[in-house]
Amino acid sequence: RTTRNKDEGRGSPQGSPLSPLLANIYMRRFILGWKVLGHERRLDAHIVNYADDFVICCRGTADEAARVMRSMMSKLKLTVNEAKTRLCRVPEESVNFLGYTIGLCHSAQTGRSYIGTRPSAKKIAALKAEIHELTSRRWLWTTVEDRVVKLNRKLRGWSNYFCLGPVSPAYRAIDRHARHRLRQWLRGKHKLQSRGTSRLPDARLHDKFGLMRLCDRPRSFPWAKA
């Protein structure tokens, strides 16, 4: 923890429940003003936000939308994080928002291209790092049941959120990594010399030890969730 907020006399500590509440209050004023002042209709620019993270989706009016946004933020005495602010032309470019990459996707069924969402490379890498930590050598003293329970909990939570768009490539990559890491952990725990998969095939990891296979999970869409 730092004393930056206290020293500067502004802001709230990161992780404080007050932070998202204040963010929603100020963003509500900004979004209402955007609509009431007619910017949404005039610029055909629609705001999508979560707390203080937001994107403005528009057609050919990005420069003007950015100028108006900065002007309104200034009047609300809010500071725009310029390091995280940029103009993005989709589908030539992609943008990351709330862990998803929004950009050009390809349909596996038709082969056609479309603008859609997929889990971002950063979030996939972060999950792989967490799987690696859960199967590191410092956990060799635990049981395989304990490792699988913790791995499955992590995999289930991640896939419950990342279930939109073409997720199969990400799921396959994560499944491979989870199997590889659990296999490495089992070799270390039981001092197995074989480096192949003959003694620890995929079926054994999933069927005997119970490791979750993301590719077999039914798709769970947000509008069907409580």
Model-found features: residue ranges?
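Non-catalytic terminal/accessory segments
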Residues: 1-226
